[in-house]
Amino acid sequence: MPVSVGSYGQQAQPSCFDRVKMGFMMGFAVGMAAGAMFGTFSCLRIGMRGRELMGGVGKTMMQSGGTFGTFMAIGMGIRC
């Protein structure tokens, strides 16, 4: 059966900005997960409890998420 040539079924490719944005979001999610594990371990190891523990873990999650997200965004930008 011949294949139709029309534009039906073809999807537009994402723009370079969309790819960089997606790379940042994926990297941020992975960095947050890693930050939750490492932050919890390091905060419990030094004896943090309660509100101090939540603040320390949250700070570590945001830092690692932002760092890894930035590197993933740069990597996706290079691939554009």
Curated annotation (Swiss-Prot):
It comes from the Eukaryota. Residues 42-60 are annotated as: Sufficient for antibacterial activity. Pfam families: Romo1 (PF10247). GO terms for biological process: cellular response to reactive oxygen species; defense response to bacterium; positive regulation of reactive oxygen species metabolic process; protein import into mitochondrial matrix; protein insertion into mitochondrial inner membrane; replicative senescence. The keyword Signal does not apply. The keyword Transmembrane helix applies. It is found in: Mitochondrion inner membrane. The chain crosses the membrane at residues 22-44. Keywords: Antibiotic, Antimicrobial, Membrane, Mitochondrion, Mitochondrion inner membrane, Transmembrane, Transmembrane helix. It is a single-pass membrane protein. InterPro entries: Romo1/Mgr2 (IPR018450). One of its GO terms (cellular component) is TIM23 mitochondrial import inner membrane translocase complex. Belongs to the MGR2 family. Has antibacterial activity against a variety of bacteria including S.aureus, P.aeruginosa and M.tuberculosis. Acts by inducing bacterial membrane breakage. This is Reactive oxygen species modulator 1.
